[in-house]
Amino acid sequence: MGKDTIADIITSIRNADMNRKGTVRIGSTNITESIVKILLREGFIENVRKHRESNQYFLILTLRHRRNKKESYKTILNLKRISRPGLRIYSNSQRIPRILGGIGIVILSTSQGIMTDREARLKRIGGEILCYIW
């Protein structure tokens, strides 16, 4: 039984967003750094810092919160893990799903690295569907 780092960061971000926390601290690996770069580029998180504590690196994410006039707080970040260690889900470039008609993003692991669904369609490559974000 291995550790699923992608599910861990998705759960950490989702829990912090639901509890109105401003920051999240997650372990730094190559995969988590790639996913966090995509989240930052797409505007789902506000800031990222790399922090070192006794030979271990951590990423400190600053979450983006939007306030609604009717409610004091509204969760805008929804994440769902798709492919998992027990059941891998693959897709070619034509069958990559669109989330909310293109508003959300799909993060894929391809032969050219971790990228969004739009980038994979432009490059016409498929891969393993890691998660949905909307």
Curated annotation (Swiss-Prot):
One of its GO terms (cellular component) is ribosome. It comes from the Eukaryota. It is found in: Plastid, Chloroplast. GO terms for biological process: translation. Its main location: plastid. InterPro entries: Ribosomal_uS8 (IPR000630), Ribosomal_uS8_CS (IPR047863), Ribosomal_uS8_sf (IPR035987). GO terms for molecular function: rRNA binding; structural constituent of ribosome. It holds the Pfam family Ribosomal_S8. Keywords: Chloroplast, Plastid, Ribonucleoprotein, Ribosomal protein, RNA-binding, rRNA-binding. PROSITE patterns: RIBOSOMAL_S8. Gene3D superfamilies: 3.30.1370.30, 3.30.1490.10. Disulfide bonds: none annotated. Part of the 30S ribosomal subunit. Belongs to the universal ribosomal protein uS8 family. One of the primary rRNA binding proteins, it binds directly to 16S rRNA central domain where it helps coordinate assembly of the platform of the 30S subunit. This is Small ribosomal subunit protein uS8c. It comes from Olimarabidopsis pumila. The gene is rps8.
